[in-house]
């Protein structure tokens, strides 16, 4: 008996459960409307049960998978919104959401793969439309799993690539790679299996380890919008600067990467999408607003611009040379977390030791030991001190996070100061009074020749519209200044540029 239908969506003990549409609708109605984590977990378990029912007619299994898929959409979107709003330190909640979503998308993908395989075996003309739709939806589910792995800066393993290769083979055998179908209901629901494949592969080669989770999401939505302009070929071609082994033996990569033996090569590239992305970037620069036709309404223009610039850079036929030469080194790096870690330095309660494997004038490439750095994401601030004679505690920002097949993480750090200096800052009021002093970190010892200094402050600690007074802790030097602009912001810091007006001594 189908005991998996018991619990939140079945008949209680499951002894008289029946696999039919009514049972699926009953299960969907039982999903907790305001607890999307629980709903995703229940969906994953329920679909796992569905996937064991091979003796059930495939048309019925597909109809049920479709119903559950529709119910999962709202919860999946809510969990994505919650995930992107999390602070890097919220690891328990991050892990809970991530595991729930991944379990649901994997079970849904498995359901569609199973249905597609059965449709392909039966070769029924009646079910051909469902075969094509099942293949496209299975490919979409693989893309969503890859997206969530990348959001966590994880490594996409061989299993995903083999499933993608298998789905392509099924579509090729059925002659439906280019067939335009309704993948999902809605205005933007039409597409082809080839587009779904290219959307997945382009996401994988877009170096999302250089984007924050929120900008990764923006990039994925942009990739979906531009996917009709992507191209592919069975042989090397002008606009196809990436390659994938359809046997699933390795992740997609640039064509100059080593190709596995006996590979079935699939070449692809952004092609006209690169020009289309650049056109949107130009419009953003001209108007300061996000165009309505790219599906990113309501997204901050600066996030869209950053994500699109990143995509355009990584889709180019050849990557430009680095601005700074990397030098191989072997030393350790003491690391502290966030704004508080920068201020505390050696006194921080939590410190980690990373291994530097290369260095440049701009920063470091480091290896993060196993079970360390689970709080890492692009854009976070770290305090750091290299293992060098006379080195001070400085500050850096994480610019890249990547994982390999062994789970080892590599991090790219941009150093924003080699010696971080403590200070306090307060607002200077019109009547001569002072606001409450707040602790800050000076990134510059003195103003530049043109009078500018950069300072790290906590977000929203100042309006930055009034005159400010900065006191350098080590010697009591005072700087009177106005904010010139926020250079960048992170989860727990604003990096602000100030123009100094006067310098006095206490």
Model-inferred region functions:
Residues 108, 142, 194-205, 494-498:
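Short, hydrophobic/proline-enriched secondary-structure or compact coil segments at domain edges
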Residues 391-393:
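Short, mixed charged/polar active-site loops
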Residues 293-389, 400-415, 419-420, 429-506:
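Short strand-loop-strand
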Residues 156-323:
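Extended, domain-scale alpha-helical bundle/helix-rich regions
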Residues 62, 83, 112, 153-155, ...:
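Sequence-level detector for tyrosine residue identity
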